[in-house]
């Protein structure tokens, strides 16, 4: 089963950066890892993970990473906002709709703080 809502044809780096979002999201917010001790957990740091991705894909780096990091978090906030709308209309199908809708603002705030930090 495929979920076409999030399917894209475009820059594969955007998909990788979407995956990196877990490093910047607070623990307890979806699959957020921010603030956890990666070494203790045996998880590579964000920089180590990016370096491994670049090595395996033959890239010198991810020059648009800051922009894409902000974009993917805002995109997730927009998706959560859509779920909030479905919840308000009584058409939300997920048992987790209420919890998902509740993180709209925290995600938007995270994206905005990343934009400010990156001076975008």
Question: Language-model segments: which ranges?
Answer:
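Activation loop entry of protein kinases
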Residues: 1-2, 14
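Regulatory N- and C-terminal appendages and interdomain linkers associated
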Residues: 84-120
């Amino acid at each position: 089963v495929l979920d076409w809502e999030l399917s894209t044809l475009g820059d594969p780096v955007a998909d990788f950066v979407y995956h990196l979002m877990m490093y910047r999201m607070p623990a307890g917010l979806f699959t957020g890892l921010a603030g956890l001790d990666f070494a203790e957990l045996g998880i590579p740091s964000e920089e180590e993970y990016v370096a491994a991705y670049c090595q395996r894909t033959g890239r010198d780096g991810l020059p648009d990473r800051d922009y894409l990091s902000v974009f993917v978090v805002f995109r997730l906030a927009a998706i959560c906002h859509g779920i909030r709308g479905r919840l308000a209309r009584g058409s939300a199908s997920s048992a987790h709709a209420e919890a998902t809708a509740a993180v709209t603002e925290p995600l938007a705030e995270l994206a905005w703080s990343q934009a400010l930090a990156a001076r975008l």
